[in-house]
Amino acid sequence: MADKSNSEDNKPKFMKNEDGTPMTQEQLRQKYGVDFTKEGRDGKLKYGPDDPTAMSNRVQFLAKADSQYYDPCAEASKMSLNCLERNNYKKAMCEEYFQIYRDCKKMWVSNKKQSGEIFETENITNPAGAATEGQEEWFPLVDQYLYILLLTWNVCVPYEAYMV
């Protein structure tokens, strides 16, 4: 049985040279004409079409109803399932899509662990417009809502429900 500690052995076949050594990003670009690691907004590598911290995902998260599960890597998941359907459920044909999904999930979990929060709320605008007289800012409510989400993971309950 192969040693699982060596991550190079776990690479899909399309990412290996003929002699079995892993390809560099430049070799992958030359062979397939695709940049698998496009630079993200902040100069970090991005491995797939999904970006868990993108503004569109933040807005989508805020639009979810109570207790609805939120998956920031839904697009990568759909792509891998569609690939399986197209290829008669042969997993070997869809390794690239599975790797993209795994990388998205890793990025999501690492971001969550590093920051302690799923999203940064400083760039989210007030959906109701400017706060009127007597209203509090919208941002503290978002922070409280996200904090409750972090505590419950798959079940999202509004902060007001805990204030009863």
From Swiss-Prot:
Residues 70-112 form the CHCH domain. It comes from the Eukaryota. GO terms for cellular component: mitochondrial intermembrane space; mitochondrion. Disulfide bonds join C73-C104, C83-C94. A motif (Cx9C motif 2) lies at residues 94-104. Its main location: mitochondrion. InterPro entries: COX23 (IPR051040), Cys_alpha_HP_mot_SF (IPR009069). Residues 1-19, 36-49 have a biased composition (Basic and acidic residues). One of its GO terms (biological process) is mitochondrial respiratory chain complex assembly. Keywords: Disulfide bond, Mitochondrion, Transit peptide. It is found in: Mitochondrion intermembrane space. A motif (Cx9C motif 1) lies at residues 73-83. Residues 1-50 are annotated as: Disordered. Belongs to the COX23 family. Required for the assembly of cytochrome c oxidase. This is Cytochrome c oxidase-assembly factor COX23, mitochondrial. It comes from Yarrowia lipolytica (strain CLIB 122 / E 150) (Yeast).
